[in-house]
């Protein structure tokens, strides 16, 4: 059923969100709060820039991975027993559209911290409320025409709207202090993520037969592909200077 499709898709993308957004946000908030108390502008800029960089470093490739390999992922994890090919395809569609919102979901966790660190809880509350209202409104308006798939579409779309609202407010209030190098790093992350995507597409095509619905060891082959592609991405990021030891020290 549609509820099951959304449930299984949600379980998969929540794992990516926990790593890309929640983990970075949890670590950065207390350090950022302390920096604001000290009024240390250089430290604030450093923490904000590194938080966004780490968030995008993890969320952009995760997003592309879910979009490109949604069917193979769902098939490998749940394509057994009473879970039919139709169930795999429907769940994969939901996962794909959730995938488009992964960077936004992660960024929301980071950008809201920039307000929380200043003891401003009202702005994140109102933006969260707006996201929920927009999400529900889009889902209700288009549900009859599009079906259950509008729910992940609305979720991703409304979250991106929230990100843009955060960005506008942070810029207008001059709460955003970013290093100039951040934009260069974002360009590198996008470039490496696109390159990783081509490698992933190539690998999925090569092992297409082994990832078939009837294959007994499809989960093993998918795990090998994920490990290979992830290793390629991380090594590439290290070689171009994105993965330095100091990059993980948010202070």
Descriptions of predicted regions:
Residues 1-251:
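Membrane-embedded alpha-helical bundles of multi-pass transporters/translocases
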């Amino acid at each position: 059923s549609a509820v099951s499709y959304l449930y299984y898709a949600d379980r998969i993308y929540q794992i990516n969100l926990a790593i890309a957004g929640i983990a970075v946000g949890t670590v950065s908030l207390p350090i950022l709060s302390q920096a604001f108390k000290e009024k240390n502008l250089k430290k604030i800029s450093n923490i904000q820039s590194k938080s966004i960089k780490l968030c995008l470093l993890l969320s952009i490739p995760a997003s592309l991975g879910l979009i490109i390999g949604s069917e193979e992922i769902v098939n490998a994890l749940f394509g057994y027993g009473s879970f039919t090919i139709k169930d795999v395809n429907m769940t994969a569609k939901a996962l794909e559209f959730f995938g488009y919102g992964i960077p936004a979901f992660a960024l929301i966790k980071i950008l809201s911290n920039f307000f929380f660190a200043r003891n401003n809880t009202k702005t994140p509350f109102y933006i969260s409320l707006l996201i929920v209202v927009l999400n529900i409104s889009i889902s209700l308006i288009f549900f009859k025409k599009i079906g259950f798939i509008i729910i992940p579409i609305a979720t991703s779309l409304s979250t991106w709207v929230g990100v843009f609202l955060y960005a506008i407010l942070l810029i207008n209030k001059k709460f955003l202090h970013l290093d100039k190098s951040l934009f260069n790093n974002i360009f590198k992350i996008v470039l490496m993520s696109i390159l990783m995507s081509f490698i992933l597409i190539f690998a999925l095509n090569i092992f297409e037969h082994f990832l078939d619905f009837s294959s007994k060891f499809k989960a093993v082959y998918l795990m090998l592909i994920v490990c290979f592609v992830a290793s390629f991405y991380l090594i590439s990021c290290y070689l171009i200077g994105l993965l330095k030891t100091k990059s993980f020290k948010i202070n």
